[in-house]
Amino acid sequence: MPRPRPLLLAVMAATLADIILAADPAPAGPAPRPPNFLLIMADDLGIGDLGCYGNKTLRTPHLDRLAREGVKLTQHLAAAPLCTPSRAAFLTGRYPPRSGMAAHGRVGVYLFTASSGGLPPSEVTMARLLKGRGYATALIGKWHLGLSCRGATDFCHHPLRHGFDRFLGVPTTNLRDCRPGAGTVFGPALRVFAAGPLAALGASLAAMAAARWAGLARVPGWALAGTAAAMLAVGGPRSASCLGFRPANCFLMDDLAVAQRPTDYGGLTRRLADEAALFLRRNRARPFLLFLSFLHVHTAHFADPGFAGRSLHGAYGDSVEEMDWGVGRVLAALDELGLARETLVYFTSDHGAHVEELGPRGERMGGSNGVFRGGKGNNWEGGVRVPCLVRWPRELSPGRVVAEPTSLMDVFPTVARLAGAELPGDRVIDGRDLMPLLRGDAQRSEHEFLFHYCNAYLQAVRWHNGSAVWKAFYFTPNFAPAGANGCFSTHVCLCAGPAHVTAHDPPLLFDLTRDPGERRPLTPEAEPRHREVLDAIDAAARAHRARLRPAPDQLAPRHLMWKPWLQLWGGGGAGGGAGAQDDSGHAHGDGSHAHDDPGHAQDRGDDDAHYGGHATTRTQATPR
């Protein structure tokens, strides 16, 4: 038998080795640690307010740094042009009507802490999903999604019931009425929302009383008493709330306790930024989700002495620049702790700038939406197109720009997938994973259609087909005065009623690729595909509505009104019983979160020159 040749033996050995290696591959290296998440949201910030989006006069160096080091999105869209529904959609990845967080009436946000509406406990937030994956979770800043349902301390809508381990912030929002000398929103609100019903009830009461006194008709006493009670129900709570609004509604909570009443705006931005840095420090050894929700730049405007009067845009500009400082302070904490590479940082605004905000002398107190029409409260691009910056050094190339349509709702599935959490299978999730676009693996958004709601009413639909982005309006707000860029007579545009909106049949159609400012509606004569585009959009709208399950209206008048038995006083958490627990049943209230970590000095950095180098004293939580 001939002996095998050496070359043949070598080939056979190599082949056998390949087979063995293919059948039993070498063990892979350890899987990368799931990222941390720092999600930052401004309030009422316009896309035209940041240097990285073209502003040349406001100083936003820390946000501009995020843009350079990460990805900038230029067609990022709020799911609603108002605070409450937009934030509900952000945390759940769902259009606001799916959770009942879209009003059928005129008022679309919570004004009182003692209202019974809020984000339903049945909704699944990103915090709840990530908490189930072992993440530490915190919300610092503004909530605005309700507090309690039936009693002042049941806290059914509280952040701790929605997956957050830690909450330091305001349960509702920042309003002019919260800061002495900043004016009021209730004068216009009473005029717009209560004047008509009160006038009608008053006229009825006067007519019945006159008829009874003159003997012209037999008017029972219960009719007079009932009408008077109705007047009290309409005007009384609002008037009482106006008189005592600040102590009742403007307070800072530390978990379940009232930590400060009324809110002290001095050093508030520093306090929130320091609390965020402290949370990072305490949880640097485990994955975390931190939602930093600034009160800036909603009125009432505020800024510490180091920022007040420094900007070229008055109190509004001062607020923007102080907020940017706060962002920088938290980014510096990530750097100091060596966490920047492993942390996905996301920055946005809940909706566009409030263009109707004016000062006592008529000066502009709101922000800039750049070239875009409209603003907060309506679905023109200025109301829903918001800044968006995403940085994750481990995964994302710096300096990229994504111009595709994306949504605040996309953060929910993106965060869930990266954390290894399973999306809930018993409900529709409207958001889409952003990572293929952010990495550059995909060039097209997964959103073919996006639906723009004004409260519970579908106002417009966006269609991204091919290279075009079409937008069709079923109704548009009536700007007042005529020719203005907002609804100055009502302080914000309303969503229904012939005096406030104009219906369009056929819908008003724009091509945002050619006309991003929505100045030139298309006609059948100018656009050959006019009918084809509208037919496709109408079909998508019908299919979308067919998938909407009715949900209890959390912004119905009965849930919006002030209810004295829900008013939270004192420490709030004392004797809370079952109410003093988070969504997993863990009790809170030992006050341990209220103290600075004594083992770590808080480096102040060069930016503290704005504050004169003084540390801020943190108010302890009221004992519970």
Swiss-Prot record:
The modification 3-oxoalanine (Cys) is found at residue 83. Catalyzes the conversion of sulfated steroid precursors, such as dehydroepiandrosterone sulfate (DHEA-S) and estrone sulfate to the free steroid. It is an enzyme of class 3 (hydrolase). Residues 217-220 are cytoplasmic. The gene is Sts. Its cofactor is Ca(2+). Disulfide bonds join 149-156, 178-250, 454-495, 487-493. This is Steryl-sulfatase. It catalyses: dehydroepiandrosterone 3-sulfate + H2O = 3beta-hydroxyandrost-5-en-17-one + sulfate + H(+); estrone 3-sulfate + H2O = estrone + sulfate + H(+).
